[in-house]
Regions:
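Membrane-helix interface segments
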Residues: 44-45, 97
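An active-site-proximal "capping" alpha-helix that borders the catalytic cofactor pocket
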Residues: 30, 74-89
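Short alpha-helical hairpin
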Residues: 1-12, 52-58
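His-Asp-centered metal-binding catalytic motifs of divalent-metal-dependent phosphohydrolases/nucleases
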Residues: 45-65, 80, 102-110
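Divalent metal-dependent phosphate-bond-processing catalytic cores, especially two-metal-ion Mg2+/Mn2+ enzymes
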Residues: 5, 16-43, 54, 110-202
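Short glycine-enriched, charge-decorated loop/helix-capping segments at active-site entrances
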Residues: 65-71
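Inter-helical turn/loop segments and adjacent helix faces that build the functional surface
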Residues: 91-95
Length: 202
């Protein structure tokens, strides 16, 4: 199977399983960011592509637990690393590259320590997706459907934490440059929200 064929198969799988539907957009945006971040670097783009398209499968409704208490301790990364090999084999993805894909998925979160170039690129891209207008949109979209917060105040606290901690986690200089306008946009939004709502945000 050609490169284009297994990529299309992976995209189709995620398009079919993305629930809520708005979660689908994270994958193509994330991959586009990896291409910007990775420009001039030597890395396996197939590995990055497969990892960024599959990395959040475990947060989709239908893949994550329904019970709220179980969801609070749900390890979506462990779920994906278990499921991804069979999905990739079904898509005729090169089997020799699957371990590298799993390594990217295992270390894609801000608190993780990536050890490969592919993982570092993907992790930086995922951090950027949590900043700026997109980061705001994704955070607010979780209200009422995520166990981490249910009120606007809790969402505001999440945005404040993202602003404070995430930019410091970026490793690649291109990522840091791309973060500058995103940080400014998010900071402006947070300040406006605090000003407009005052003590009555709820």
């Amino acid at each position: 199977m050609t490169n284009e064929s297994y990529r299309a198969a992976i995209e189709t799988y995620i398009a079919t399983h993305a629930n809520p539907t708005h979660k689908f957009g994270h994958q193509p945006r994330l991959y586009a960011l990896t291409q910007q971040i990775g420009e001039g670097l030597t890395y396996d783009d197939d590995v990055v592509f497969a990892a960024v398209w599959l990395h959040d499968l475990g947060v989709f409704i239908g893949h994550r637990p329904d019970a709220e208490e179980t969801l609070k301790t749900w390890d979506h990364v462990a779920y994906v690393t278990e499921k991804a090999p069979s999905i990739l084999k079904e898509a005729a993805f090169p089997e020799e590259k699957i371990p590298a894909v799993l390594e990217v998925i295992r270390t894609h979160q801000p608190q993780d320590t990536p050890i490969t170039t592919e993982a570092t690129i993907a992790r930086d891209a995922d951090i950027l997706e949590q900043l700026g207008a997109i980061g705001i949109t994704r955070t607010l979209a979780k209200l009422g459907s995520d166990t981490r917060f249910c009120t606007f105040t809790e969402a505001l606290h999440a945005l404040q934490k993202q602003l404070t901690t995430l930019p410091l986690q970026l490793r690649i200089e291109t990522s840091k440059t791309l973060a500058i306008p995103r940080i400014a946009a998010m900071q402006s939004f947070v300040e406006a929200l605090e000003s407009e709502a005052g003590p009555n945000l709820y």
